[in-house]
């Protein structure tokens, strides 16, 4: 099976420039919680990422909008289904990918800051979100 980290049809990604991230790190308010990268991967066939500890310099939130995927953290593997999210902590090796038969559609955010660990606490396992009539997710 091929493994792809990006390049999906219809994908969107924004990576903040390094100088802007450095400014945020110095800002009294901005340094508490800031985004470094944000994106959307629709129907991400063969999506796969594996990072060693030294490569993980931010927290990573992944929200599965459709389909299925998985992630590995601390030698445990977790299944992820539609309307679930998880946050991978900084400085921890991990891997994740889409299901071969039913690949996920995901939104993802890399973030950091002095309050990032507080913000992400308890979300290192899949958490479900129940869509509501006024969720507006389909408008995105």
Q: What are the residue ranges of the model-derived segments?
A:
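Generic detection of long, well-ordered alpha-helical segments
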Residues: 28, 58, 131-135
């Amino acid at each position: 099976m091929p493994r792809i980290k990006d390049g999906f049809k219809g994908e969107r990604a924004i990576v903040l420039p390094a100088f802007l991230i450095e400014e945020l790190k110095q800002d009294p308010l901005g340094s508490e919680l800031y985004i470094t990268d944000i994106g959307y991967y629709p129907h991400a066939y063969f999506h796969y990422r594996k990072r060693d500890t030294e490569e993980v310099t931010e927290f990573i939130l992944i929200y599965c909008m459709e389909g299925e995927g998985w992630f590995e953290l601390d030698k445990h593997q977790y299944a992820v289904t539609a309307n679930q999210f998880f946050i991978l902590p900084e400085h921890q090796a991990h891997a994740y990918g889409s299901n071969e038969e039913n690949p996920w559609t995901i939104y993802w955010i890399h973030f950091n800051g002095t309050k990032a660990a507080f913000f992400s606490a308890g979300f290192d396992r899949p958490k479900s979100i129940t869509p509501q009539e006024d969720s507006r997710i389909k408008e995105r």
